[in-house]
Amino acid sequence: MNNSKYVFAQLTVFLDRNHFNYLVRKYGGNKYVKHFTCWNQLLAMMFGQLSNRESLRDLVVAIEAHRSKCYHLGFGKNVSKTSLARANQTRDFHIFEEFAYYLVGEARRKRATDIFKLDGNVYAFDSTTVSLCLEVFWWAKFSKYKGGIKIHTLYDLETQIPAFFHISTASVYDSKVMKEIPIESGAYYIFDRGYNNFKELYRIHCTGSFFVVRAKSNLQYKCIKWKRRLPDGILTDAEIELTFSDSRKRYPEHLRLVRFFDEEQSREFMFLSNAFELTSPQVADLYKNRWQIELFFKWLKQHLKIKRFWGTTENAVRIQIYSAICAYCLVAIIQHDMHLDRSTYEVLQILSMSLTDTTPLKDLFNKTIFKNDKERFGFNEPTLFDNFD
């Protein structure tokens, strides 16, 4: 059935066009549009992500090289640099943001697991900074001479899918964005030291959710009671009360303090949590799994285009980031639905070289043989989605 369909066209079958069209109607995205629709725009942007294009000009040149295939690839009649740049600059980014969230929901539903054996979902929250030229991206002012944006992400550690993302200028403190996090009752939220915002931690506590946050070294507290028999690696497991007046005002209840020594790194870590039911090794293990979000950021920057932007306006930057997230989720959905026993790096490499081929997807992934990433490049390539049901 797919013998005459291009690989990229086969990929788009995994996208819900009806839902995307609903969002286009909701925001009037195709108003006064004759040829280059929002759907054409989305596919062009995702083609650029999957084919590893470096710039808008690079993307348009690549599409122009396949002019005769444009219609069957889903781009419409043709794609010019002017039309794509104008679309990214003027069309409502909420269309692409909400579609990215829709794909996030689909990917998370398909990849649901129970790795931690806990009743609620387990999330890590962190941000990554992308530096920008202040003269060009004037709206992203960070300091007098620098520009940049932050991508704040709530990462589902079990499905390995970003559940929530918030884009801000780089000048915004990480802890200030905690108020934007959607809180689920019974879920677990893992934070690094930059998120010692006791007001927001107490909000999580009051909604019946749990948190584990790495404590700052200058934390002021007093022990209320502590455990004397401790598992290996656990130095302290105590119930504490905050003593600094402002902190105690923001978090008036007792907290749990766990000090853990990591033999692999020869480092000591101190955590705060409201999860008194967990064992102390479970608390430490939850934090140790926070590294997955750092791998996600590294993977996103290395293999999708969010470090070099194809437009200079805030709207264009947002559309590019949401297109990258759509591409990320598309790979996750394909891996699950096709039961691919490959890393995301392998899947992307295969796709980037084959988007305009007419090989059926099943044959494409079965016939292409890649050596182990580490053997090929001599370094540890972060891989995600490697395990699925």
Where are these regions (language model features)?
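A glycine- and small-aliphatic-rich helix-loop capping segment at beta-alpha/alpha-beta transitions
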Residues: A140
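A short, well-structured juxtamembrane/interface segment
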Residues: G105-T113, D174-S175
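Major-groove recognition helix of helix-turn-helix-like DNA-binding domains
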Residues: L73-R91
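DNA-recognition alpha helix
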Residues: S55-L73
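Short alpha-helical linear motifs
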Residues: T82-R86, A107-K110, T368-K374
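Single, function-defining residue in the core of a domain
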Residues: M1-D58, R91, E98-Y102, K117-N121, ...
